[in-house]
Each structure stands twice: as C-alpha cells, then as structure tokens.
C-alpha cells in the first residue's frame, strides 16, 4: 500500500486558503490602520501590508489560513528551496523554478536553505542533508540535526497536517528521521518516494528550535503547542515583535540571519477586512502592499502612477464540489451535465475581468504533469439537458450551492451559474455562509454543492492528485471514489521514475475529468499590488509573499 494512502483524514484539518475575516465598514478600519507606532515609522525601513486577516496561529501544524502564510515564511526556514528565475509575464518579478530537470537529483532545481548540501540515494529511499553550521534561531540556539528530528517527530505525534506530510513523504515512524551526526540528518522510507526532496521546499515543513520549544513546553506540553501558537521559534529571517489578533502583527529583521539581514527592517502586517479599504490605503500611500483585491479594483489600480500591479499565472484553483454521496450527484451524467451548464467564459469576463483562465484540469496548470486535453465541458445547455435526460432527471431537480460570504467572487459566480441552470430545469438555492464558519461547512461534507478554493503547495502531480482525489484523503471533499484512480496514485507514489509517474498521472487525470467530481470554474491569477518603488517581489507556489525579498 502506498504511503500516500496512509493519511486517514480525521487528523488532518486543512483550512481553506482563501478564507477571510468577516467584513467591517471602511470608516472603522481607517483610523486603526493609519495609527502605526512611531517606532515602526522609519522612512524606507518599514513595510506596511494591508491584509484581510492577521495570523490566527503561528503553529503551521494546525493552521492554514490567511495571515499565517506570511508569518510562517518570515519566522521559519526549511531545508531546501526552489531556485528563482525571471517571470516571463512580470518583468520586475521572479518565480520559483518548478519545472522538471532530468539532470538534477529528484528532477528538481533546488537551492540549499538550512541544508548546505544533500544527497538522494539512487534507490529513492533515502535522502541525507548536511546542515549549515553556525545558523542561529531567534533565541540564540544553534541549528542541529536534533532540531530536524524533533520537528518531524512532532508531526508524527500531533497528527493534523503533520499526518499528511509524513505520510505523503513515505515516513512510517519517527525513527525514519535519523540523526547521523550533529549537523547531518537522514530521511529513510521503505518504498521509493518522489517527494523526499520536494517536501522540504514546502512552506509548512519548517524546522523548529527544539531547545527553546522543549524548555517552554516542559513536561506538561512536550511539543510546545501553546508556545508555538503565539511565538516564533525558528531560524527564519524575521522574529516576531508583536501579535495582536484582529489588528496587526509586527516583525523585526534579524541581523544574525544566516542569509544576511533583510533590506526591510520592520514589517507591519495590518488587518483590513474589506478590499475597498485596502485599495484606498494603497492609493493614499498609507500602506506598501494591498493583498487579495477584487478584479475591478485591480483594474482601477493599474491607472494609479504611484502603484505597480502585476498579475501572473498561479497555482490557485477555484471549483465547486459535487458531493458524490448526495443524490443526484452520485450519478456521473448529472455531474457532467452540471459542467456543460457552467458558463465558464462568461464568469471569466464578467467576474474576473479576464484576470483568470478556464479551469480545464484537476491540478494546477503551471505544475509538471498537468494535462488539459481531457476537458470537454465547453458551455452547452443542449448537451447538459441531454445528459440529464440520460440520467432520468429530464424534468430537472432542486439543489443547494453554499458559498463563502468573505470571498468577493463566489456570490457573483453563483448567481451566473444559478441563471444558467434554471434554463435546463435545475433550481439552485444559494446559501451564503459567513466566512468564519464556511470551512466547517466544507469539511462536514454535508452540502450537495459547495465552493472551494485551494492550491496544492508541492508542485508535483502525485501530491496534487492524491490530495483531492484519493478516496481516503481528508481533503477529498467531493467524496469522489474510483478504485482505478486510487491504484494509479498508489503506483505513482511507489516509484521515483518520473516518466512512469507522469504517464500514470495522465491516466488518472483522464478518468477524473471524465467523471467530473467538480464543477470546474477557474484558475485565478495571483496579483501583486504595491507601491511602485517597492522591488524584489517573487511569486511562490504557496501564493504568499516573503518579506525578505523586498527592498527600495
């Protein structure tokens, strides 16, 4: 049995990547956002970011939500990272090189971060990492192999997201991560695993300062859950200076960071729940970056001389889960009909202002192994009606579509979809769910139809397809199950032969697309809206920014 299939869902509690805080009036936000303490207001040395939400937790084993992404990236480092290359569509930006490189170990163009060097055994069952010496945490403790071992042991013991990361890497037990020397650590698996290197580039596989964590957690909290939730304990470029949830987080650059002190001394990460307020603050020069804006707002900012706006293809996907355990979506022809009825191009133009592309596959189209050749659901109401007739639903049916009130695009998409379905006799009730409770609606899997937005952070076809379509995956919210797909995913996980993996990924995509577990919506672009004098932005597949990249 493949290690991919070992992660049994209940432990995994993955937050919706685009879940945002509930909106408040712009007038209430403005005084607060502009009240930046004078200690942080040094010209040119402070970066102010307007974001939908502050970090809910600093423990990446339990939280995947807006605001947490940037915090984790600032406070922690992993063993490896992808090499950076110029972005073809954004001349002033870079992006991670996630292409397959047959001449490199694991087929990946990587650079060392906490690891100085690394070796992948030809068997694909063992990876050895030599750590940089003299790397200090924000608490003054030196990085050792014990920190890496403790970090992964924590993942084993606490489960949650750790249950997924250990399983997807093929690790069966804590002893599979071994301290070979003070600065050498190895990862050992029973079957060849193609993610033994790639997994260490993931934003949510950082290394903790185990000395500090053990001291703070003590015997009552051996894995330092309470401490890590509210404090930094890492080897990253910044340390946490202040965290006031619902208001702001403040980060201070570390002069002793092994990669050199970042150009920006202080980062003030302000919570501004409404996108209109974030736009206003950027236009007025009160903030340097405005995150997660509506398409029309993005268009308007392109005419502001003091602002630079760039949109690039991203790993984001938005779709509608069609619950295969709730009639009539247990019928494959009904699911196919729902896709033929979806006016994809109208949505892209009317809602996204062309800042998105059609979702024509079941994994990010920028990832190796993606195939768009199996999408055949161009808008065709006659075809949709024909399939409903075939399914015995020719007279139509009633259903419910739940959407996130905190996501500015889901409601207009739902209204357009509702109108199209009405033409073939499908009455769709729209259920507006508050942002704070939306994720629970997704994970309960009780909704016949529900929006979902996500991005598989590891740019690998096996990782992506397993996450959403393995019948045992906790993130398979459509309850999709196909024995042949499970078999193909298991076979992908058990070989390091990239040609074999890509061939099986293609087979799996063909089956999945034909059986339509989702209504395929869009690939939204990633947008960076910032002051024109702010340089250095890099696009990451985790769809977050890294403070250390920026300079003026």
Language-model features: locations:
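N-terminal secretory signal peptides
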Residues: 1-12, 16, 20-27, 37
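Aromatic- and charge-enriched surface segment that lines or borders ligand/interaction sites
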Residues: 114-161, 180, 186, 278-281, ...
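Gly/Pro-rich hinge or "lid" segments in bacterial periplasmic/extracellular proteins
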Residues: 81-86, 94-105, 109, 201-262, ...
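Detector for C-terminal structural segments
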Residues: 21-34, 51, 65-71, 244-247, ...
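Ligand-site clamp/hinge motif
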Residues: 132, 226, 254-300, 418-419, ...
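Alpha-helical secondary-structure segments
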Residues: 48, 144-153, 182-188, 192, ...
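Surface-exposed binding/hinge segments that line
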Residues: 130, 165-217
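N-terminal lobe/hinge region of extracytoplasmic solute-binding protein
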Residues: 50-122, 153, 233-235
């Amino acid at each position: 049995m493949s290690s991919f299939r070992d992660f049994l869902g209940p432990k995994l509690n993955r937050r919706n990547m685009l879940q945002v805080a509930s909106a408040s009036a712009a007038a209430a936000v403005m005084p607060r956002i502009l009240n930046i303490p004078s200690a942080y207001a040094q010209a040119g040395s402070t970066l102010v970011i307007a974001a939908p939400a502050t970090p809910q937790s600093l423990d990446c084993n339990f939280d995947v939500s807006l605001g947490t992404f940037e915090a984790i990236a600032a406070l922690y480092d992993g063993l490896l990272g992808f090499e950076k290359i110029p972005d073809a569509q954004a001349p002033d930006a870079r992006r991670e090189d996630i292409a397959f490189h047959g001449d490199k170990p694991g087929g990946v163009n990587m650079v060392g971060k906490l690891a100085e060097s690394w070796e992948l055994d030809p068997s694909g069952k063992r990876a050895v990492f030599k750590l940089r010496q003299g790397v200090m945490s924000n608490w003054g403790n030196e990085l050792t192999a014990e920190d890496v071992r403790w970090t992964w042991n924590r993942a084993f013991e606490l489960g949650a997201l750790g249950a997924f990361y250990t399983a997807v890497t093929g690790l069966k037990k804590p002893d599979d991560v071994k301290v070979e020397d003070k600065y050498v650590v190895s990862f050992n698996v029973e079957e060849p695993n193609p993610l033994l290197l790639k997994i260490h580039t993931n934003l949510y596989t950082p290394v903790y300062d185990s000395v500090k964590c053990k001291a703070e957690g003590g015997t009552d909290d051996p894995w330092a859950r309470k401490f890590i939730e509210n404090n930094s304990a890492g080897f990253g470029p910044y340390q946490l200076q202040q965290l006031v949830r619902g208001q702001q987080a403040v980060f201070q650059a570390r002069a002793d960071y092994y990669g050199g002190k970042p150009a920006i001394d202080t980062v003030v990460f302000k919570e501004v729940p409404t996108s209109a307020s974030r736009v206003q603050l950027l236009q007025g020069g009160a903030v340097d970056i405005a995150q997660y804006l509506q398409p029309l707002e993005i268009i308007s900012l392109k005419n502001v001389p003091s602002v630079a706006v760039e949109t690039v293809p991203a790993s984001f996907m938005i779709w509608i889960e069609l619950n295969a355990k709730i009639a009539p979506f247990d019928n494959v022809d009904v699911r196919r009909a729902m896709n033929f009825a979806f006016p994809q191009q109208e949505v892209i133009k009317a809602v996204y202002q062309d800042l998105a592309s059609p979702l024509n596959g079941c994994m990010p189209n920028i990832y190796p192994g993606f195939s768009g050749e199996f999408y055949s659901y161009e808008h065709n109401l006659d075809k949709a009606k024909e399939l409903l007739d075939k399914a015995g639903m020719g007279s139509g049916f009633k259903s419910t579509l739940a959407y996130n009130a905190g996501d500015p695009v889901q409601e207009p998409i739902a209204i357009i979809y509702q109108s199209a379905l009405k033409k073939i006799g499908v009455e769709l009730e729209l259920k507006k769910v508050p942002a704070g409770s939306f994720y629970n609606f997704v994970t309960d899997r009780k909704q016949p139809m529900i929006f979902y937005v996500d991005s598989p952070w590891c740019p690998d076809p096996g990782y992506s397809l397993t996450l959403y379509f393995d019948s045992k995956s906790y993130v398979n919210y459509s309850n999709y199950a196909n024995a042949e797909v499970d078999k193909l995913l298991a076979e992908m996980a058990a070989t390091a032969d990239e040609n074999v993996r890509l061939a099986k990924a293609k087979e799996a995509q063909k089956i999945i697309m034909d059986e339509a577990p989702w209504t395929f919506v869009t690939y939204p672009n990633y947008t960076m809206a910032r002051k024109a004098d702010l340089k250095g932005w890099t696009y990451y597949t985790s769809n977050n920014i890294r403070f250390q990249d920026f300079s003026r």
